[in-house]
Amino acid sequence: MSTGRTLAYGALGLPLAFAALPIYVHVPRLYAEHAGLALGLLGGLLLVARLLDAFSDPVLGWLADRLPKRGLIAAALLPLGAGFFLLMHPVEQNPALWLGVALVLTYLGFSAATIAYQAWGADLGADAGSRTRLVAAREGLGLLGVLLAAALPSLLAPNLADGLATLAWIF
């Protein structure tokens, strides 16, 4: 497999990793400070969303084995993008419900995209060497996504809420 195709495959690793970090690093502070949610409630919502994710992942894996991977990835990016955008724009009315719905959408889309993406990489590699290069491209660009997600909110705006709102538009 050519270097260009390997990097093209790995490119999706950047936005997927870009989406994951803010949920744990920035969202609790954002919802505590700007929506007034108690940290215990925030932790509970994050836990429930992840527990739902634990039940959906086997189903998503089963689907990834039976459906075209690229189509599943494309379909998964819709709830991921919508959920991420909603997460970064807390509302004043019912912020806990808003956060819960946004987390479920984000996690569902993220899990579906990630599971299908990793399965697709296994399918693309003709041998162990090519699969290793695909994983290296995916993980290397994913690391770049983590670095960008960590740095951009503070570089984009003088406060967390505005930085995350801008980050959501970039995503």
PLM regions and their residue ranges:
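Membrane-embedded alpha-helical bundles of multi-pass transporters/translocases
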Residues: 1-171
